[in-house]
Amino acid sequence: MKNKILVTGGTSHLAKSLKKYLPDAIYINGRADLDLTNYSDTLEYFKRESPDHVLHLASKVGGIKSNMENPFEYFYDNLLINTNVFRACKELGIKRLTSILSTCVYPADNVEYPITEDNIILGDPEKTNRGYAQSKRILAELTDLYNQKYEGEYNYIIPCNLFGMEGSYDPNKTHFLTSLIYKSAKALSNGDAELEMFGSGKVLRQFVTYDDFARILVYCIDNNITESFNYSPDYNLSLIEYGKIIEDITDGRIKVKFNGNGPDGIYRKDADNRRMKLLATNFEFSDLKESIKEVLDFYLENDNI
């Protein structure tokens, strides 16, 4: 019999990709469906739907500026969401819970790169998103300790930065690469030759598409993968290098310039992907340059976004 899957965060960009591969799953589409900060409502909803597997995507997210200005809100709201989802799964005996974390859970200093899954609580996270990171760390600890005590099949996946065709553009919630692509499309539409981005451009980041990450989630379901792991590609590029890809795709019509203003965030946070490769031996990432071009074309064709 096919497992019944419940997905939190059904309006997220990742969920929009996931719906293409898991159309029959139950998606919680924001607070209109369920307020995950309310435990009694969460428990009642989960009890009524009675899923076999919960994919926990929901979280309060934002960019560096928003995280720096509101660390308490990011910690408190996400702590409520995560513990309520976890508690409901535990109380109802739901067999599988897969939670989505972020590489921001890893220490900012005194760590070897690429960073492995056993380094989550070995130092303080990057201060620019401390509140969000700490809430995700607690979720990882809950998962590990639950499995240790109950021999459970709960796990978490730690993806690198994601990008894709996000629809409406929100500068306060968008990662660098989607912002770069969106602004490049606007510059092309306006006939501008130079695009200015904040920061030094020297920091290193890994980016993969929402679609690719959705595919690995489905792969884990289909192959009953219950271990926790990092999800990341082999490359780790500077933001300047991502800018060069844009310049190449646009045949030099766009020149990307970094103005040196604003916080860069942590210099690097590339994740070790050896465990992922052992677990998902047949999985292949989409080509980065082609994926960036697809997103750029999307924004050019939808210039009202």
What do these predicted regions represent?
Residues T8, N29, V54-K60, L97-T103, ...:
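SDR active-site strand-loop-helix element
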Residues P23-E44:
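Adenosine-cofactor binding site in Rossmann-like domains, unifying the SAM/SAH pocket
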Residues S12-H13, K19-Y21, K186-I305:
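C-terminal substrate-binding subdomain of Rossmann-fold SDR/epimerase-dehydratase oxidoreductases
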Residues K2-D24:
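Canonical Rossmann dinucleotide-binding motif of NAD(H)/NADP(H)-dependent dehydrogenases/reductases
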Residues S40-L79, E91:
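NAD(P)H-binding glycine-rich loop region in Rossmannoid oxidoreductase-like domains
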Residues T83-N129:
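Conserved Rossmann-fold NAD(P)-dependent oxidoreductase catalytic core, especially the SDR/UDP-sugar
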Residues G131, S135:
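Active-site helix of classical SDR
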Residues D109-Y113, E117-D118, D144-I221, I245-E247:
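NAD(P)-dependent short-chain dehydrogenase/reductase
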